[in-house]
């Protein structure tokens, strides 16, 4: 008689199935992590499932740094911590870790450790169908999930076309941002200078059809914590541009009533879109650095908010001799207000600007 065949599995990816196993997935993961192996483990995923008859079982995927040779069929046995019981798995070498991961992700609840190691093989005999992979990505619930699918199933595209893939998914998964909800009602701002209130009444007191073709903007200068930002943002639907200009569709909308330009230095705005934004110009294009050209509908005023002092004050900036022409243009397209006191009385707003 031939000698009995010795148990031997050699693979980078191990697929384990524990029938009728009552050990919780967290405990199973902990025990698998502690098993000594001559090759380092890179990733472990455990899935806890129940058959239709209620019988529990576990699946586990273990990925190693390199091929691991297992000659001990009891190596991956799990031990119950609540009773005297051992659970022995069916041990298989997996040709495609991606297929095993997809299989155990379908049902049950999972827990994992480490970083999944992507492979380029499929148990179906060839590359994963690109159409299947991209269809699955489109059905994902987030950009991150879609990218993970493509990383695991189409690694070549993921590496060579990553920028285009990410850009396309951002457009596909784009969701209109939730409207900003002001923390304080407009009625709490009780110290509004007359010139500011007149500007508000003149613009917001009319229907959109009755507003001028190019409304006048307003430049408000005041110390920090005077409430100017909260006041400006409480007036209605708006774009909030702070620190720099970003016309990405994720943060900038062509369907709002006005722009709030907050803490953007006058020198920066001069180099970018001073006349377009303060002058409420229509149908212009932004070519800001690091982004594709964006068409801006425009035709809405801007509330420019700034602090006093060199580099911040729009008044001081425009009073410089080299900005005389821009000064003359701006006084015909915006009104200036200097705050001498907070716009509110409540101490609750004292931490807001």
UniProtKB/Swiss-Prot annotation:
Gene Ontology BP, a term: DNA replication
Keyword match Repeat: no
InterPro entries tied to this protein: CRESS_DNA_REP, Gemini_AL1_CLV, Gemini_AL1_REP, Gemini_AL1_REP_central
Motif extent (RCR-2): 57-59
Cofactor note text: Divalent metal cations, possibly Mg(2+) or Mn(2+).
Name by which UniProt lists this protein: Replication-associated protein
Cofactor: Mg(2+); Mn(2+)
Organism encoding this protein: Bean golden yellow mosaic virus (isolate Puerto Rico-Japan)
Keyword annotations from UniProtKB, A to Z: ATP-binding, Covalent protein-DNA linkage, DNA replication, DNA-binding, Endonuclease, Helicase, Host nucleus, Host-virus interaction, Hydrolase, Metal-binding, Multifunctional enzyme, Nuclease, Nucleotide-binding, Nucleotidyltransferase, Transferase
Record-stated family: Belongs to the geminiviridae Rep protein family.
Cell compartment(s), UniProt: Host nucleus
Gene3D superfamilies reported for this sequence: 3.40.1310.20
